[in-house]
């Protein structure tokens, strides 16, 4: 399962990905924020 993360500007939790390039395609993400170090939080969470 993907780790959860939270962005101050979003309600609820997103999916945490451990890379710099942004959110991966194919998961329906439409918002993101970056979390240090080297992670990105993607909304809306997939598979929940």
Curated annotation (Swiss-Prot):
Cellular localisation: Secreted
Modification Serine amide occurs at: 46
Propeptide: 47-48
GO MF assignments: ion channel inhibitor activity; peptidase inhibitor activity; toxin activity
Domain of life where this protein originates: Eukaryota
Disulfide partners: 5-41, 7-33, 23-42
Keyword Disulfide bond: yes
Presence of keyword Iron: no
Gene Ontology CC annotation, any one: nematocyst
Pfam family, one: Defensin_4
Gene3D superfamilies, sorted: Anthopleurin-A
Keywords from the UniProt entry: Amidation, Disulfide bond, Neurotoxin, Protease inhibitor, Secreted, Toxin
Function according to Swiss-Prot or TrEMBL: Neurotoxin that induces paralysis when injected into crabs. May function in antimicrobial activity as it displays inhibitory activity towards the B.licheniformis enzyme subtilisin A (SUBTA) and the recombinant S.maltophilia protease 1 (rStmPr1) enzyme. Also displays inhibitory activity against various proteases including the porcine pancreatic elastase (PPE) and proteinase K (PK).
Family (UniProt): Belongs to the sea anemone type 3 (BDS) potassium channel toxin family.
Miscellaneous: Negative results: does not show any inhibitory activity against chymotrypsin, trypsin or papain.
Protein name as it appears in the record: U-actitoxin-Cgg3
């Amino acid at each position: 399962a993907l780790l959860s993360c939270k962005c101050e500007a979003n309600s609820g939790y997103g999916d945490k990905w451990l890379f710099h390039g942004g959110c991966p395609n194919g998961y329906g993400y439409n918002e993101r924020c970056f979390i240090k170090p080297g992670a990105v939080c993607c909304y809306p969470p997939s598979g929940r």
